[in-house]
Amino acid sequence: MTEMTKPFLIVIVGPTASGKTELSIEVAKKFNGEIISGDSMQVYQGMDIGTAKVTTEEMEGIPHYMIDILPPDASFSAYEFKKRAEKYIKDITRRGKVPIIAGGTGLYIQSLLYNYAFEDESISEDKMKQVKLKLKELEHLNNNKLHEYLASFDKESAKDIHPNNRKRVLRAIEYYLKTKKLLSSRKKVQQFTENYDTLLIGIEMSRETLYLRINKRVDIMLGHGLFNEVQHLVEQGFEASQSMQAIGYKELVPVIKGNISMENAVEKLKQHSRQYAKRQLTWFKNKMNVHWLNKERMSLQMMLDEITTQINKRSSNHDCKRKHPRPSTREL
């Protein structure tokens, strides 16, 4: 894929509770775009409040993709995200619209934007049964013990993945069980060639402001029925599913079981959310070339104006005969 034929897309990233949904919808309205969720948990049906899933009213008529596509007990990976998102980008671009990726799952977005060489992990049915049995055996381990198990055969991946990121730890273990190769070894040979002509926008603010927003959003989620949502998922038999290790769900299950108080669970939920936001910022700042917009200094309109400026500035540096032109902002 040459530079002149790369489709243009806008990517909006940032930590949890930073306002990605609101900005992405306004950008879509202004630039004739459609939105692809870049959140690893919003793919799951019935997990709405805890994942801060955009509502129909909030969409304001803007098409959204990669939301509510799987049951809570289904597995989902960066590879699967990449495959599906690529199809949506191709279709959106073909119809003359601008694909907009909005989300906070750094690995998923990075795998889409760059030429990740995912290996074929298909295995025989018997081998898959063995893998599932082993993963089932590991379910009872807490996060630290599971992380120690990963470190026993893949120290590099263990260093790169936080113990509380149970989903990524399990993914690294599953990869090894399937291929007998280390996930860390695969990453070393990745080719970071850009797949798209990307305007990568990030939302930032002071840590104090972000943490206040996170705490407030947790309170709002609880007020909107998060506990009932988690209880319903447990009653449906999804308690042991990988998706239930997401922040907002794993903290409330012990309350349902009568193991901890709601007060303690809420404090843990807020703490885990703040820690996750910190990890998100570290990922985006270290691994991606993001143009940051400060939410404390800029209004929503100022952000839109800056995005317009960036599009025009980038357009002036490219041949106007590109196959997939950026949206014109001359009449906006």
Curated annotation (Swiss-Prot):
Entry-linked Pfam families: IPPT
GO BP annotation list: tRNA modification
Signal peptide positions (record): none
Binding residues for substrate: 16-21
Sequence similarity: Belongs to the IPP transferase family.
Residues bound to ATP: 14-21
EC number from the UniProt entry: 2.5.1.75
Site (Interaction with substrate tRNA): 105
Keyword terms: ATP-binding, Magnesium, Nucleotide-binding, Transferase, tRNA processing
Quaternary structure and interacting proteins, as annotated: Monomer.
Keyword Transferase (UniProt): yes
Reactions catalysed, as given in the entry: adenosine(37) in tRNA + dimethylallyl diphosphate = N(6)-dimethylallyladenosine(37) in tRNA + diphosphate
Gene name per UniProt: miaA
Name of the protein in its database record: tRNA dimethylallyltransferase
Coiled coil: none
Molecular-function GO terms, alphabetical: ATP binding; tRNA dimethylallyltransferase activity
Positions of the UniProt region annotated as Disordered: 312-332
Gene3D superfamilies associated with the record: 1.10.20.140, P-loop containing nucleotide triphosphate hydrolases
Functional description taken from the UniProt entry: Catalyzes the transfer of a dimethylallyl group onto the adenine at position 37 in tRNAs that read codons beginning with uridine, leading to the formation of N6-(dimethylallyl)adenosine (i(6)A).
Region annotated Interaction with substrate tRNA, chain positions: 39-42, 167-171, 245-250, 278-285
